[in-house]
Amino acid sequence: MNVLGKNYNFIELLKYTLPTIMMMVLLSSYTIIDGMFVATLVGESALASINIIVPIFNIILSIGLMFSTGGTAIIGRLMGQNKNKEAREFLSLLYIIASIVCIIFSIIILVYSNDITRLLGADSILYKDALDYLITVGIFGFTLVFQCLANSLLVAAGKPTLGFILGIISGLTNIILDYIFISPNILNMGISGAGYATGIANSIPAITCTLYFIFNRKQTLYFFKPSTNIILIFKACYNGMSELVGQLSIAITTFMFNIILYYFALNDGIKAITIILYIQMLQQAIFTGYNLGVAPIISYKYGEQNHDQLKSVISISLRFLSGISIIVIIISIVFSKELTMLFLSVDSSAFSLSVRGLSIISLSYIFMSYNLFISNLFTSLSNGHISALLAISRSLIFMVICLIVLPYSIGIDGVWLAPVIAELFGCILSYYIYNKFRYVYNY
């Protein structure tokens, strides 16, 4: 029997999703270590330069998540309906289309790199480092997209542990290459070295996953003659729209964070939000990893119309994420100084600003965990419209309104409160939508 077809209790669900959670936490940890290398060996301003380019990174990530989550939902549903041949055909088509999109996007970044760097607001201090990092993003952006595909598709193929192992290898490679490329005593490549290290490390799961689906034909999923049903790609993109919208929203709001905090605290403000976003990436990885792990199970149960298991999986998930989010909030507040010290010295002019910002923003996690799961739920149920509505509401509409109103009303603390209030409004909307569709999907 397909591993997705068995009945899941809390222990079984945790066993299946834990490799994905650990994989995402490790990948985020390696990203944080990457930032620590840059801050220590290149400088705090170089770290701020990376944050200037983060919106482009988020756009590339949005493409990867759109294809991976939307495509995996379709593959999971087809497997649940015992349409394994169609699932294999769609898998092949998904890879081809993703490759074409990556090539086009990389060309655009490399051709217009100077204009993009200026557009993102890099001043004379940050411009050169920001440009150098953007070029590496353009060269290696495709690896991020295919790493997203690898993470989701290996879970759908019933191989989450393989994804976890690849995550460990990729991360360790990133750390080693960071030291070799960035260290003044070795290659001394500066901020470009960080970009090359990340790109090469991301290539490991991307290439390995591709080879797995080429040669491992004993499993349900492997590359087959590509489907000619291009409509399925549009359905996958539509279904993964919430992830696309979510990351595009992060790109927009990160740009707004940079502009507003530069107004209040110049480059110290950009340094502070950079540190906070690095730490938040690690904490949010727990929620993201769980959602990636549970998504194929939800899609499969929905495909086979197993409503009792669908209800059980959703109920367990909501309780688990609520408990984890509370733990994350407590850790963030109690150890805010220690977390900030991973990047900044205590005597840094941006230190106290980062500590206060982290302590306030962390309150949003209880609402964020619920919002992310409900949005992921509707993606898994192949309802991209509702999923996108929830994503764009919480991460763009509510966030932009809060970023405009709160800093104007109460100053710089309004910047830190904006995510908390935006996620709260998003939670109210998610709860309403979740209950409205309860009887449509019988969960």
Give the predicted meaning of each segment.
Residues 5-42, 55-70, 74, 99-106, ...:
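N-terminal transmembrane alpha-helices
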Residues 15-34, 136, 170, 201-205, ...:
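Transmembrane helical elements of multi-pass membrane transporters/channels
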Residues 59-62, 174-178, 206-210, 282-285, ...:
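Hydrophobic transmembrane alpha-helices of multi-pass small-molecule transporters
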Residues 68, 137-155, 163-171, 194-209, ...:
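Short runs within selected transmembrane alpha-helices of multi-pass transporters and secretion channels
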Residues 47-107, 144-163, 272-330, 334, ...:
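Small-residue-rich hydrophobic transmembrane alpha-helices
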Residues 29-48, 117-124, 180-189, 251-278, ...:
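Helix-terminus/linker motif at the lipid-water interface of multi-pass membrane proteins
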Residues 1-17, 75-142, 186-241, 298-364, ...:
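Short alpha-helical transmembrane segments in multi-pass integral membrane proteins
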Residues 20, 24, 36, 73, ...:
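Transmembrane alpha-helix boundary and packing residues in multipass membrane permease domains
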